[in-house]
Amino acid sequence: MSEPILTTKDLKKSYGDLEAVRGVSFSVLRGEIFSLLGPNGAGKTTTISMLSCLLTPTSGTAVIDSYTIPRQSNQVRQIIGIVPQEIALYEELTARQNLTFWGHMYNMGGKTLKMRLDEVLEQVNLTDRANDKVKNFSGGMKRRINIAAGLLHKPKLLFMDEPTVGIDPQSRRRILDMVKELRDQGMTVLYTTHYMEEAEELSDRVGIIDNGRLIALGTQDELKKLVGEQETLRLHFGEGHQANGDATLFTTIDGVLTTTAVNGELILSVKQATAVLPGVVAQANSLGLQIRSIDIEEPNLEAVFLHLTGKGLRDS
């Protein structure tokens, strides 16, 4: 097993009485993609901001490649790359000019910087747009230049904070493929997302975070074992039909373990989906709920989050 490149212990961040991050402890192994998965407001960005030396922790410790935060922040900044959730580019500058600016921030220059500019532009497949102003780029292209900026100085550890938010599916696919290529090249990535499917596709290990606390951590198989042999029934209702007030009535059905209403849909954790379906349909009919469709899902990270918190990842 690889050794950790990052270790946090009881990391906390408070703003007055508000506890944004509440004692988070985890390690990231060299060469892995480690995802922090949680809903908006869970504490993912605050955690990344502390680890990238943008925020000072209220308490706790973090060590990156033997350097301690915040005491050795200058050394840490030299070995990490950051892809922030917000686009960090100058609209009136070209892609190459933006990257040159960020290269200078890392004390890069001359032939070394020029070579790296060409390499990262090729890496994000934007060589042909290098001399175009960023203001003319799509959201997905801006995201890719953001990633290129984080890779310029060949960091040992790359932080990627929700890098696919607000972009089209094709751009999202390019970025996800790029993240996997980085891992294949030996890069260590700490990736935050509220998209369960991204965490499932990318991650070697996942930390599930909610309300500032890390509530579970492990490989996907390890996390899915928390749910046991359960399956998930997801009921979608017709227009004007919502199960919000009726969710608990489905717990009377034999084999139904838990029920949760999320945005008008009904999510049931069940022992065996096919066995409970007739009772579920009958109960919905008796309540006057028109079922549009039913999905049967094997245990996934969404089910794990629901099992641990009683709510869906996007129910926030």
Regions found by a protein language model. Give the residues of each.
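Catalytic Walker B motif of ABC-type/P-loop ATPase nucleotide-binding domains
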Residues: 158-161
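Conserved ABC transporter NBD signature motif
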Residues: 60-71, 75-76
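ABC transporter nucleotide-binding domain
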Residues: 176-271
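Conserved ABC ATPase "signature" region
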Residues: 100, 104-107, 111-129
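Conserved catalytic motifs of ABC-family nucleotide-binding domains
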Residues: 154
